[in-house]
């Protein structure tokens, strides 16, 4: 890669940028602590980011995720507080794949329009737009109120009598209620109920997720029967594959320039091999960046999975940290890049892991 094509990505946690409240309180609400807005990325602000040498800006937390903020007046179903991490919620517990986080909008009913305007401002500033695509898991109370007509809800046609079915969108623990090993009530009057329990996002296939699990999320089913030797059921194409492809095409149609694919290695490489070329057929310049932490899978996701880039967290980042802390000598840096075996130009280096 020559310098003209070199990517320099500026990551920003969108809800923090522009929030000038210097007196935030622990566990405070959006009213008490405030929240950054998409409108805070003015032409001036974006111009300053461009001056840093950035080519792309990765807006973290754009897609609507679970939150304890009540938006029922805007016809957004509330989330039970027991399954939301923090008041604002995790940006990786997606609640509606087809919508924008209302916290980020100055005018909530116009949140999608505000995002489209943000993309336009970013492009006018000479920067390209990357957003997260979170394919492995969703919020426990996922419900899309913005999905296009003719689109079915995730899980709406699932047969919950089966722990695994290649036709289901989720994995289930049949005839079992969720018994989370965490506060199942939170600030609510009644505890959270889930029957039958669904498998938790970090591949926990029982009804007892604990506080260290991704307990606020549920695992999506791409046709892999993990509890029976990881057998794959990819013919016919699983319904989840089709739904995820449609979601990527929806956001690609908003003129974004790339997806940073969260925990891409927890989704079978066969899905990416099938989906990415179909997206690129319509949007050939769209970038796909994968979060993969197993070096043994790097080439698989690059060459078979068709990703453009991976980011080198367990290689260079961890090595630099070890050298800085005195656990390794500087020669470890050379060993790190040599271990990539010729794919270093497709690895993104970072100084901080994402929030």
Give the location of each predicted region.
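Structural preference for beta-strand elements that scaffold enzyme active sites
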Residues: 7-11, 56, 126-130, 258-260, ...
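N-terminal structural segment of carbohydrate-active enzymes
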Residues: 1-128, 136-138, 143-147, 159
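Active-site-proximal helices and loops of the catalytic beta/alpha 8
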Residues: 137, 149-150, 159-180, 243-351
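Short, acidic/polar
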Residues: 35-49, 235-252
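Aromatic- and acidic-residue-enriched segments that line the glycan-binding/catalytic groove
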Residues: 65-90, 136-212, 303-310
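Conserved small/polar residues in nucleotide/adenosyl-binding loops
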Residues: 353-355
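N-terminal small/glycine-rich loop or linker at the start of catalytic domains
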Residues: 3-30, 204-233
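Short, well-ordered alpha-helical packing segments
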Residues: 46, 98, 115-123, 131, ...
